[in-house]
From Swiss-Prot:
This is Late cornified envelope protein 2D. Skin-specific. Expression was readily detected in adult trunk skin, adult arm skin, fetal skin, penal skin, vulva, esophagus and tongue. Not expressed in the cervix, rectum, lung, colon, or placenta. The gene is LCE2D. The keyword Iron does not apply. InterPro entries: LCE. Disulfide bonds: none annotated. Belongs to the LCE cluster present on 1q21. Belongs to the LCE family. Keywords: Keratinization. Pfam families: LCE (PF14672). Precursors of the cornified envelope of the stratum corneum. One of its GO terms (biological process) is keratinization.
Length: 110
Protein backbone atom coordinates (compact mmCIF):
# COMPACT_ATOMS: atom_id res chain seq x y z
CA UNK A 1 0.00 0.00 0.00
CA UNK A 2 2.75 2.42 0.89
CA UNK A 3 4.63 1.53 -2.31
CA UNK A 4 1.61 2.35 -4.48
CA UNK A 5 1.09 5.64 -2.67
CA UNK A 6 4.70 6.60 -3.28
CA UNK A 7 4.33 5.89 -7.02
CA UNK A 8 1.25 8.11 -7.25
CA UNK A 9 3.08 10.95 -5.53
CA UNK A 10 6.02 10.64 -7.91
CA UNK A 11 3.82 11.08 -11.01
CA UNK A 12 3.64 14.65 -12.38
CA UNK A 13 0.42 16.50 -11.61
CA UNK A 14 -2.11 16.18 -14.46
CA UNK A 15 -2.83 19.93 -14.58
CA UNK A 16 0.61 20.71 -16.00
CA UNK A 17 0.42 21.31 -19.78
CA UNK A 18 2.61 19.06 -21.91
CA UNK A 19 5.64 20.68 -23.45
CA UNK A 20 5.63 21.38 -27.17
CA UNK A 21 7.94 19.21 -29.19
CA UNK A 22 10.84 21.10 -30.76
CA UNK A 23 9.90 19.91 -34.26
CA UNK A 24 6.46 21.47 -34.50
CA UNK A 25 4.89 21.63 -37.98
CA UNK A 26 4.97 25.14 -39.47
CA UNK A 27 1.71 27.05 -39.22
CA UNK A 28 2.18 28.75 -42.60
CA UNK A 29 2.71 26.97 -45.92
CA UNK A 30 5.94 27.57 -47.83
CA UNK A 31 6.22 31.03 -49.30
CA UNK A 32 5.00 31.57 -52.85
CA UNK A 33 7.26 33.07 -55.50
CA UNK A 34 7.43 36.85 -55.10
CA UNK A 35 5.53 37.46 -58.31
CA UNK A 36 3.65 34.93 -60.38
CA UNK A 37 3.78 35.50 -64.15
CA UNK A 38 0.56 37.27 -65.13
CA UNK A 39 -1.06 35.88 -68.30
CA UNK A 40 -2.30 39.32 -69.35
CA UNK A 41 -1.00 42.82 -68.95
CA UNK A 42 -3.61 45.30 -67.72
CA UNK A 43 -2.24 48.03 -69.98
CA UNK A 44 -2.73 46.02 -73.18
CA UNK A 45 -5.85 46.79 -75.16
CA UNK A 46 -8.41 44.11 -76.00
CA UNK A 47 -7.88 44.71 -79.73
CA UNK A 48 -5.17 43.19 -81.85
CA UNK A 49 -3.40 45.23 -84.46
CA UNK A 50 -2.00 43.75 -87.67
CA UNK A 51 1.52 44.64 -86.58
CA UNK A 52 1.33 43.10 -83.13
CA UNK A 53 0.30 39.68 -84.42
CA UNK A 54 -0.94 38.51 -81.05
CA UNK A 55 -1.85 40.15 -77.77
CA UNK A 56 -3.86 39.55 -74.64
CA UNK A 57 -6.87 41.57 -73.60
CA UNK A 58 -8.54 41.70 -70.18
CA UNK A 59 -11.80 40.20 -71.41
CA UNK A 60 -10.67 38.11 -74.37
CA UNK A 61 -7.94 36.13 -72.66
CA UNK A 62 -5.72 36.28 -75.72
CA UNK A 63 -5.61 36.89 -79.45
CA UNK A 64 -4.82 34.61 -82.32
CA UNK A 65 -1.64 35.18 -84.25
CA UNK A 66 -3.17 33.93 -87.50
CA UNK A 67 -4.32 36.73 -89.78
CA UNK A 68 -2.58 39.48 -87.84
CA UNK A 69 -5.78 40.91 -86.32
CA UNK A 70 -7.51 37.82 -85.08
CA UNK A 71 -8.97 37.89 -81.64
CA UNK A 72 -10.08 35.06 -79.38
CA UNK A 73 -13.66 35.21 -78.19
CA UNK A 74 -14.23 35.41 -74.48
CA UNK A 75 -17.23 33.08 -74.43
CA UNK A 76 -17.54 29.66 -76.02
CA UNK A 77 -21.15 28.79 -76.72
CA UNK A 78 -21.93 25.25 -77.93
CA UNK A 79 -24.87 26.55 -79.96
CA UNK A 80 -22.50 28.57 -82.15
CA UNK A 81 -20.23 25.64 -82.96
CA UNK A 82 -22.31 24.78 -86.03
CA UNK A 83 -21.11 28.03 -87.66
CA UNK A 84 -17.57 26.74 -88.04
CA UNK A 85 -15.59 27.90 -91.03
CA UNK A 86 -12.08 27.20 -92.25
CA UNK A 87 -10.88 29.08 -89.17
CA UNK A 88 -11.13 27.94 -85.57
CA UNK A 89 -14.46 28.92 -83.96
CA UNK A 90 -12.88 31.09 -81.26
CA UNK A 91 -11.08 33.48 -83.65
CA UNK A 92 -12.20 36.26 -85.92
CA UNK A 93 -10.28 38.00 -88.67
CA UNK A 94 -9.79 41.72 -89.20
CA UNK A 95 -12.70 43.57 -90.71
CA UNK A 96 -12.50 44.44 -94.43
CA UNK A 97 -12.65 48.13 -93.50
CA UNK A 98 -9.19 47.85 -91.97
CA UNK A 99 -10.19 47.91 -88.31
CA UNK A 100 -8.65 45.21 -86.22
CA UNK A 101 -10.88 42.58 -84.69
CA UNK A 102 -11.95 43.63 -81.20
CA UNK A 103 -13.35 41.49 -78.45
CA UNK A 104 -16.42 42.98 -76.88
CA UNK A 105 -17.74 41.98 -73.49
CA UNK A 106 -20.29 39.77 -75.21
CA UNK A 107 -17.53 37.90 -77.01
CA UNK A 108 -18.08 39.37 -80.45
CA UNK A 109 -15.83 41.20 -82.89
CA UNK A 110 -16.14 44.65 -84.37
Amino acid sequence: MSCQQNQQQCQPPPKCPPKCTPKCPPKCPPKCPPQCPAPCSPAVSSCCGPSSGSCCGPSSGGCCSSGGGGCCLSHHRPRLFHRRRHQSPDCCESEPSGASGCCHSSGGCC
